[in-house]
Amino acid sequence: MEKLQNRILQEGHALSETVLKVDSFLNHQVDPDLMYEIGTYFKNYFKEHKITKIFTIESSGIAPAVMTAMQMNLPMVILKKQASKILNGDVYQTTVHSFTKGLDYELTLSKKYINKEDNILIIDDFLANGEAALGAARLVQESGAKVAGMGIVIEKSFQPGRKMLEEKGYDVYSLARIAKLEKGLIEFVK
């Protein structure tokens, strides 16, 4: 997606060889027009996949996921990173390691919001090592539902996430694929 790549080049900051800061339009301040366009790309790519629900992981995936859900006229479910007293234990849970934060968390899904007939599209802001996406997929599979695909806003193609997900048979669609990061340099997959 050329518009997204341009925003990354204009406003993104490669803080290291593995960390890209895009907080001015994606995960701190959000550009709703860009998110709407991102939703359009995901809708167009996944329109034949018979999606029943959009899933995302709190919190940075919420903006692109809600725009995708709006455009597909589907409900969106937010997978929680922390246990909540209001979920009453009737949940699916799996442990996920966060690359960005360097810690483990319990990804949680209320059983109330998924059934075995569901065909789930997982939307996330970043794909690096694939841990978050795999965790979300485990929750979907534990319920008996199916993962129809994964929509990623920004993929770090130099990390193993895509390869791992594709080896497990997932349809991964990324809007911006980064080939290389260096302090002050961002290169896209050609």
UniProtKB/Swiss-Prot annotation:
EC number(s) given by UniProt: 2.4.2.22
Reactions that this protein is recorded to catalyse: XMP + diphosphate = xanthine + 5-phospho-alpha-D-ribose 1-diphosphate
UniProt-listed SUPFAM superfamilies: PRTase-like
Superkingdom of the organism of origin: Bacteria
Pathway(s) annotated for this protein in UniProt: Purine metabolism; XMP biosynthesis via salvage pathway; XMP from xanthine: step 1/1
Main location: cytoplasm
Residues at which 5-phospho-alpha-D-ribose 1-diphosphate binds: 128-132
Enzyme class: transferase
MF annotations from Gene Ontology: xanthine phosphoribosyltransferase activity
Keyword entries, A-Z: Cytoplasm, Glycosyltransferase, Purine salvage, Transferase
CDD domains: PRTases_typeI
A single GO BP: purine ribonucleoside salvage
GO cellular component annotations of the record: cytoplasm
Residues the record lists as binding xanthine: 20, 27, 156
Compartments where found: Cytoplasm
Gene3D superfamilies tied to this protein: 3.40.50.2020
Pfam families tied to this protein: Pribosyltran
Family indicated by similarity: Belongs to the purine/pyrimidine phosphoribosyltransferase family. Xpt subfamily.
Assembly mode: Homodimer.
Name the UniProt record assigns to this protein: Xanthine phosphoribosyltransferase 1
